[in-house]
UniProtKB/Swiss-Prot annotation:
Protein name: SLIT-ROBO Rho GTPase-activating protein 2B
Signal keyword on record: no
Oligomeric form and interacting partners: May interact with SRGAP2; formation of the heterodimer alters SRGAP2 function.
Phylogenetic placement of the source organism: Eukaryota, Metazoa, Chordata, Craniata, Vertebrata
GO cellular component: cytoplasm; glutamatergic synapse
Ranges for domain F-BAR: 22-324
Coiled coil: 362-400
Length: 458
């Protein structure tokens, strides 16, 4: 004899769901902390780069002895206890690789210290300042969008909880109604059997003396049977009604379950990736431009520098947002990995885990399917248009941040008049009218890009 199957109680199902949601909520919180940490590390990196080139400009004026001191200073800083965690977390990212190579290159510098100092102060440092400002601004916007995405995801999870509770309630009502119906059926069978036994046990009497008694007894039995039949009909109707509600509630639960899993998958697989892309929007390209400016100056130095500069150039070539994003997600895999899918939890022996397409819910499901197909067709057309707009906007931003304006070879075209050379190299990076116009266009395009992102999601 097999033991009866043990079903999970409502409290157990709710507790498991709450635990899974709490884990997701904790993961979402850690994601924001991780992005905040990356922003802080990036700001620190950019600040270090600014401090580095500012100090380097001063040292260029004091020749190679002071250049050696600069290299030792920053190498010691990166090896200090305070920066151990920073180095551990960032040693695989391409910008940090460039930073380490720059420190090694300092020992090789030995030419035209006045020109290099002027380029460092009036060209490279303003670029890092610009990158820091842009990065902070974009991160703030990205964080707002990310918070909204997380709020939307939690809203979906809360809606699933509500639908699941409704399913439990209606399924419990259906089971209760079924139990009452079975009880009425048993009473009916019992009453019918009792009536048959009473008729069989009656002793023969004369027609004249027992006619009235038999008629009265039959009337009483029929009345009792009719009452039970009426009660059975009511309970049958109640059971049918509750069963239909339970089926509809289960269908809603299954649909909500599928939608929730799709939303969770979309957030972890697509939205997080896009969110990190937004945080990095233009960062690597702008850093690439700043470091290429440095390379343009350094490549005009003595031939003895070429080996070190080639190594840095290779690192700059490898500045890649996609690779760094992949490394970041691998380093924090437990934060960015998708959670387990929500599984259907059968309630009180209800083992049907598929949508019920039988009458009387078939027509309703067909109508809903048609509505969803129509809506999906409309959304597909809209999304194609939005995708084209996003690609065009993103390409515009990429064109702005990848403009090749890092060549400073003209600064090394010496003439008999050093004043003319100084006048040429002293024109600061931020003072050019075209730069200001391009900056305005960049910010306007960024604003439009995020507006579209916020309206249509990731």
């Amino acid at each position: 004899m097999t033991s009866p199957a043990k079903f999970k109680k409502d409290k157990e199902i709710i507790a498991e769901y709450d635990t899974q949601v709490k884990e997701i909520r904790a993961q979402l919180t850690e994601q924001m902390k991780c992005l905040d940490q990356q922003c802080e590390l990036r700001v620190q990196l950019l600040q270090d780069l600014q401090d580095f080139f500012r100090k380097k400009a001063e040292i260029e004026m004091d020749y190679s002895r002071n250049l050696e001191k600069l290299a030792e200073r920053f190498l010691a800083k990166t090896c200090s206890t305070k920066d151990q965690q920073f180095k551990k977390d960032q040693n695989v990212l391409s910008p940090v690789n460039c930073w380490n190579l720059l420190l090694n290159q300092v020992k090789r510098e030995s030419r035209d210290h006045t020109t290099l100092s002027d380029i460092y102060l009036n060209n490279i440092i303003p670029r890092f300042v610009q990158v820091s400002e842009d990065s902070g601004r974009l991160f703030k916007k990205s964080k707002e969008v990310g918070q909204q995405l997380q709020d939307d995801l939690m809203k979906v999870l809360n809606e699933l909880y509500s639908v699941m509770k409704t399913y439990h309630m209606y399924n419990a009502d259906s089971i209760s109604a079924q139990s009452k119906l079975k009880e009425a059926e048993k009473q009916e069978e019992k009453q019918i059997g009792k009536s048959v036994k009473q008729e069989d046990r009656q002793t023969p009497r004369s027609p004249d003396s027992t006619a009235n008694v038999r008629i009265e007894e039959k009337h009483v039995r029929r009345s009792s049977v009719k009452k039970i039949e009426k009660m059975k009909e009511k309970r049958q109707a109640k059971y049918t009604e509750n069963k239909l509600k339970a089926i509809k509630a289960r269908n809603e639960y299954l649909l909500a379950l599928e939608a929730t899993n799709a939303s969770v998958f979309k957030y972890y697989i697509h939205d997080l990736s896009d969110l990190i892309d937004c945080c990095d929007l233009g960062y690597h390209a702008s850093l690439n431009r700043a470091l290429r400016t440095f390379l343009s100056a350094e490549l005009n130095l003595e031939q003895s520098k070429h080996e070190g500069l080639d190594a840095i150039e290779n690192a700059v070539e490898n500045l890649d947002a996609t690779s760094d994003k992949q490394r970041l997600m691998e380093m924090y895999n437990n934060v960015f990995c998708p959670p387990m899918k929500f599984e259907f939890q059968p309630h009180m022996g209800d083992m049907a885990s598929q949508l019920c397409a039988q009458q009387p819910v078939q027509s309703e499901l067909l109508q809903r399917c048609q509505q969803l197909q129509s809506r999906l067709s409309t959304l597909k057309i809209e999304n194609e248009e939005v995708k084209k707009t996003m690609e065009a906007t993103l390409q515009t931003i990429q064109d702005i941040v990848t403009v090749e304006d890092f060549d400073v070879s003209d600064c090394f075209q010496y003439s008999n008049s050093m004043e003319s050379v100084k006048s040429t190299v002293s024109e600061t990076f931020m003072s050019k009218p075209s730069i200001a116009k391009r900056r305005a266009n960049q910010q306007e395009t960024e604003q439009f890009y995020f507006t579209v992102r916020e309206c249509y999601g990731f």
